[in-house]
Structure formats: structure tokens, C-alpha cells
Amino acid sequence: MSSKSKFVRRQRIKRRVRSVVSGTEQRPRLTVFRSLSHIYAQLIDDVNGHTLVAASSMPSKGASLLKGKKSDVSREVGKALAEKAKAKGIDAVVFDRNGYRYHGRVKALAEGAREGGLKF
């Protein structure tokens, strides 16, 4: 499967899922973006169009770079996202895997968020 057809497939799945899955302020949408070297996760309120909480494996100012296997780093990102969400009073989310298969880093991030206390 060429990279273009993979991209087109993911975009088609993404549109189809987005028409059904929607986040609110009480139960935001947890969306995942996966690049070759990093992973990003956001809690989005689709009603107002705002990102409520975000976490990534990309180091921010003053933060250290997460080391280890990509799936282990993804699990830590999920836990960090859950901590930030708990601080904002969010405990339930709707999971949007963004067209990616529920496998590997996406699965590890979801499990980390569950370990951190998020329900979905």
C-alpha cells in the first residue's frame, strides 16, 4: 500500500468518525496525532471549538525529553494528559483515534490515559 493511499484511507476514516464522534465540555474528544518520532494528544470541546488540554512527547520549555521506546513514551504522554485533565475537572472522554489503527502507540496512549484515571 503506497503512502498516498494510506493517507487517503486515513482521511476517509477520519471524516466518517468525525461525523459521529463529538466532544462536549463535560466529555471532550481525546484525539491523537502520530508522527514518525512523536505523539500528540488533545482534549477538544467541539461545541465551542476549543482545545481544553494537550500533551505530547515533544519537550516544551524547561521539560526534559522523554526517553525509551516509542510505545513507552506514548503511555507516559497518556498519563500526563490524564493528570492535566483531572486538574481541569475532566474525568470522562470520547476517544478519537484519528483514523489510526488501535494498535501500538495509539493503544499505549489510550491505556496510559486509562491508568491516569480517564474513562472512555
Swiss-Prot record:
Annotated GO CC locations: cytosolic large ribosomal subunit
GO biological process: translation
Spans through the membrane: none
InterPro entries, A to Z: Ribosomal_uL18_bac-type, Ribosomal_uL18_bac/euk
Recorded GO MF terms: 5S rRNA binding; structural constituent of ribosome
Keywords assigned: Ribonucleoprotein, Ribosomal protein, RNA-binding, rRNA-binding
CDD domains, A to Z: Ribosomal_L18_L5e (cd00432)
Secreted in keyword set: no
Pfam families for the chain: Ribosomal_L18p
Keyword RNA-binding carried by entry: yes
Domain of life of the native organism: Bacteria
Family (UniProt): Belongs to the universal ribosomal protein uL18 family.
Quaternary state and interactors: Part of the 50S ribosomal subunit; part of the 5S rRNA/L5/L18/L25 subcomplex. Contacts the 5S and 23S rRNAs.
Protein task: This is one of the proteins that bind and probably mediate the attachment of the 5S RNA into the large ribosomal subunit, where it forms part of the central protuberance.
Annotated PANTHER family: 39S RIBOSOMAL PROTEIN L18, MITOCHONDRIAL, LARGE RIBOSOMAL SUBUNIT PROTEIN UL18M
The protein's name in its UniProt record: Large ribosomal subunit protein uL18
Gene symbol of the encoding locus: rplR
